[in-house]
Amino acid sequence: MSELLATYLLTEPGADTEKKAEQIATGLTVGSWTDLPLVKQEQMQKHKGRVIKVEEREGTAASEKQAVITIAYPEINFSQDIPALLTTVFGKLSLDGKIKLIDLHFSEAFKRALPGPKFGVYGIRKLLGEFERPLLMSIFKGVIGRDLSDIKEQLRQQALGGVDLIKDDEIFFETGLAPFETRIAEGKQILKETYEQTGHKTLYAVNLTGRTADLKDKARRAAELGADALLFNVFAYGLDVMQGLAEDPEIPVPIMAHPAVSGAFTSSPFYGFSHALLLGKLNRYCGADFSLFPSPYGSVALPRADALAIHEECVREDAFNQTFAVPSAGIHPGMVPLLMRDFGIDHIINAGGGVHGHPNGAQGGGRAFRAIIDAVLEAQPIDEKAEQCKDLKLALDKWGKAEAV
């Protein structure tokens, strides 16, 4: 019988942790057990949850008690979709005190019902023809209220700086100044021109927004227009919505999952989901080719262990393509050695102000990032590289080098 394993962190679980775990296993499956007659227990046994592990530990405060428990849920109890799964293992339980869902282990049968990334790390690299270094992405900044001519010029300047990907701001919606379809068409023309000028290919991720009922048609139209990638605020819509986009054969476009709203689900040490589960495993399983999340050293920083755990879930060996991890927020060129130390080659360096705020503009910012990436790959001293690349020197003079965390 196939089972799904859910692992929880309980804070102040009560005097009897084993009893609490058994109550959860029973309460979220058959509802009651000891009150059932023996014949009914035999009939219901295949539906009953099982306690797999109970491990007590000290909490963050000296007087605080915590426990990690793992419960097996028979998959016969729910349909093979994420809404049914989450309602089963963390529906009413999420309202029952200090309980955090930290991991899910899926059966191979359930995995077959999920799409995973269409492209993944290798597929994105293949689109760009770049396999030997971290990719570099920049972000449109300050575009609210700007018309299409401003958007086009920002796109051009970023591409000329040598970035591999450019994404819309997640708060850039349909307001009439720069319509979705027009941005795609005009963006493709700009990037065609910069490729002809530099020989460097750049992809543009356009923000897919609007009412849920309209998203598939809008995404299909984007695909028809040749969109390179779709930025998607997955946690404003739901994982199942992203899954629907990812598994649609008429939307053969990479999906870039933005973490907006996810902090409401992950930030508490006592409630919600672990960062690794929500931004790593579930994003990957539901079809994200890219997963953005705060880096350990930027302006909106995650603890290093949490950021590394997200990355691990994105790339660990599994039934699905790997998801590109995109540590973000407040990234500048001086952070690149830390990013490459912690996340290796297969991640994307994502910068906004670190590109646009460069003294030589977005082109200079892109060149500074590319120079320091090359220096790290070649084991060249950063200061030596800065003497060879004026843009890098200006960036380091402005932002400095990030300290190890």
UniProtKB/Swiss-Prot annotation:
EC number annotated for this UniProt entry: 5.3.2.5
InterPro entries in the cross-refs: Diketo-Methiopentyl-P_enolase, RuBisCO, RuBisCO_lsu_C, RuBisCO_lsu_C_sf, RuBisCO_lsu_fd_N, RuBisCO_lsu_N_sf
Pathway, per record: Amino-acid biosynthesis; L-methionine biosynthesis via salvage pathway; L-methionine from S-methyl-5-thio-alpha-D-ribose 1-phosphate: step 3/6
Residues spanning the membrane: none
Modified residues (N6-carboxylysine): K167
Binding site for Mg(2+): K167, D169, E170
Domain of life: Bacteria
SUPFAM superfamilies: RuBisCo, C-terminal domain (SSF51649), RuBisCO, large subunit, small (N-terminal) domain (SSF54966)
Ligand binding (substrate): K141, K167, D168, D169, E170, H258, G330, G352, G353
Top enzyme category: isomerase
Active site annotation, chain numbering: K92 (proton acceptor)
Any one Gene Ontology BP term: L-methionine salvage from methylthioadenosine
Coiled-coil intervals, chain numbering: none
CC cofactor: Mg(2+)
Catalytic reaction(s) noted: 5-methylsulfanyl-2,3-dioxopentyl phosphate = 2-hydroxy-5-methylsulfanyl-3-oxopent-1-enyl phosphate
Textual note on the cofactor: Binds 1 Mg(2+) ion per subunit.
Keywords: Amino-acid biosynthesis, Isomerase, Magnesium, Metal-binding, Methionine biosynthesis
PANTHER family attached to this UniProt entry: RIBULOSE BISPHOSPHATE CARBOXYLASE, RIBULOSE BISPHOSPHATE CARBOXYLASE LARGE CHAIN
Subunit structure: Homodimer.
Family per similarity comment: Belongs to the RuBisCO large chain family. Type IV subfamily.
Record function comment: Catalyzes the enolization of 2,3-diketo-5-methylthiopentyl-1-phosphate (DK-MTP-1-P) into 2-hydroxy-3-keto-5-methylthiopentenyl-1-phosphate (HK-MTPenyl-1-P).
Note, other: Has no RuBP-carboxylation activity.
The protein's name in its UniProt record: 2,3-diketo-5-methylthiopentyl-1-phosphate enolase
Organism: Bacillus subtilis (strain 168)
Lineage of the organism: Bacteria, Bacillati, Bacillota, Bacilli, Bacillales
